């Protein structure tokens, strides 16, 4: 089984504060995640002045500002990107960022990013998909809100414009913050695998870590999860994010699950082998048996340990003649 890649999604939980963004990088690195991911955008390039906030954003941000005003406060400029990439390198964690507009695609490409993460909202954005495809980079494509037809169309655009199909990973996702458990539909991961024959992961917007863990057990090769310094901070995504200790627990338990998946061959494990003779049973004298007596249900039984004749041969011995004397509880040796 491939190692599951863990993307710790800082997103916009830095609240526009570069020092907080650096702290989030340190938390992600300490947790054991493989990547820390931010979001790159020029708000005016991707949000019109008429765009309304999503219902979850209305609950977690000021009601007297537009979506554009809310998002403008969360922008990271070129200098900030460079500082964060350098800080991630110092912390020994890979840097990712999701571009939300064409200008930001160029910015991330110029900064040398090797992997481009396409968010669910851009899966129907033709100019955006074509631009990323032409970079011929590895792509992680989130599929929240999309049906199989829309995903197929996006894949066709990517592959016809320069992206290599084998370099694309799909992420199943439910685009709601937090996502209701009854709408997660983890079985859709298998539907994506069957339909497109690509690696499939899961972008988790539920509360807690257990749904991500279930996704790993179902074969997710990537897990993406939002995290924050404090869920009670002001901002659109904090409430649906993990706090540092939860992120660390997620990473630890994902690694444990991966070890537990094994190779699928059913056999006694190395640690079990020493217990075979201890917990299995052998043929034992139920009471004293004299030489020449016939073994019967009345004088023959099965008990631990298993270093005698296997209890599976019980019926084979019924009716046989004992060739020696046995004391009660003595292992049968014939």
UniProtKB/Swiss-Prot annotation:
Domain of life of the source: Bacteria
Which GO biological-process labels does this protein carry? bacterial-type flagellum organization; carbohydrate biosynthetic process; glycosylation
Report the Pfam families cross-referenced here.
NeuB (PF03102), SAF (PF08666)
**UniProt domain AFP-like: residue ranges:** 282-334
Which Enzyme Commission number(s) are on file for it?
2.5.1.101
What range does the record give for the signal peptide?
A: none
Is Transport among the key words of this record?
no
Q: Which GO terms describe its molecular function?
A: lyase activity; N-acylneuraminate-9-phosphate synthase activity; transferase activity, transferring alkyl or aryl (other than methyl) groups
Q: Does the keyword Transferase apply?
A: yes
Q: What class of enzyme is it?
A: transferase
Quote the catalytic activity from the record: 2,4-diacetamido-2,4,6-trideoxy-alpha-D-mannopyranose + phosphoenolpyruvate + H2O = N,N-diacetyllegionaminate + phosphate
Keyword terms of this UniProt record: Bacterial flagellum biogenesis, Lyase, Transferase
Tell me which SUPFAM superfamilies the record gives. AFP III-like domain, Aldolase
- Role, per record: Involved in biosynthesis of legionaminic acid (5,7-diamino-3,5,7,9-tetradeoxy-D-glycero-D-galacto-non-2-ulosonic acid)(Leg), a sialic acid-like derivative that is incorporated into flagellin via O-linkage to Ser/Thr. Catalyzes the condensation of 2,4-diacetamido-2,4,6-trideoxymannose with phosphoenolpyruvate (PEP) to give N,N'-diacetyllegionaminic acid.
Q: What is this protein called?
A: N,N'-diacetyllegionaminic acid synthase
Could you tell me which species this protein originates from?
Campylobacter jejuni subsp. jejuni serotype O:2 (strain ATCC 700819 / NCTC 11168)
């Amino acid at each position: 089984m491939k190692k599951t890649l863990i993307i710790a999604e800082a997103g916009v939980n830095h609240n526009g504060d570069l020092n907080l963004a650096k702290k989030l990088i340190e938390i992600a690195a300490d947790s054991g995640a493989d990547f820390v991911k931010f979001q790159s955008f020029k708000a005016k390039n991707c949000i019109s002045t008429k765009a309304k906030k999503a219902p979850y954003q209305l609950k977690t941000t000021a009601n007297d500002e537009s979506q554009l005003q809310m998002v403008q406060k969360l922008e990271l400029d070129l200098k900030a990107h460079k500082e964060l990439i350098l800080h991630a390198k110092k912390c020994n964690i890979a840097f990712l960022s999701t571009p939300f507009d064409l200008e930001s695609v160029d910015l991330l490409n110029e900064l040398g990013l090797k992997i481009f993460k396409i968010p669910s909202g851009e899966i129907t954005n033709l100019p955006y998909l074509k631009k990323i495809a032409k970079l011929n980079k590895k792509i992680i494509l989130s599929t929240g809100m999309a049906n199989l037809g829309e995903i197929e169309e996006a894949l066709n655009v990517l592959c016809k414009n320069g992206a290599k199909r084998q370099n694309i990973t799909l992420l199943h996702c439910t685009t709601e913050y937090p996502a209701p458990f009854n709408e997660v539909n983890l079985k859709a991961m298998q539907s994506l695998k069957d339909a497109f024959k690509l690696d499939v992961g899961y972008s988790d917007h539920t509360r807690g870590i257990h749904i991500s863990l279930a996704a790993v057990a179902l074969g997710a090769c990537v897990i993406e999860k939002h995290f924050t310094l404090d869920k009670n901070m002001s901002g659109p995504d904090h409430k649906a994010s993990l706090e540092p200790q939860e992120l660390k627990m997620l990473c630890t338990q994902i690694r444990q699950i991966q070890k537990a998946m094994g190779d699928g061959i059913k056999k006694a494990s190395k640690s079990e082998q020493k217990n075979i003779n201890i917990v299995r049973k052998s043929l034992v004298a139920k009471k004293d048996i004299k030489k020449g007596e016939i073994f019967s249900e009345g004088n023959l039984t099965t008990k631990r340990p298993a270093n005698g004749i296997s209890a599976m041969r019980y019926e084979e011995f019924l009716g046989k003649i004992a060739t020696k004397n046995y004391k009660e509880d003595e292992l049968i040796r014939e």
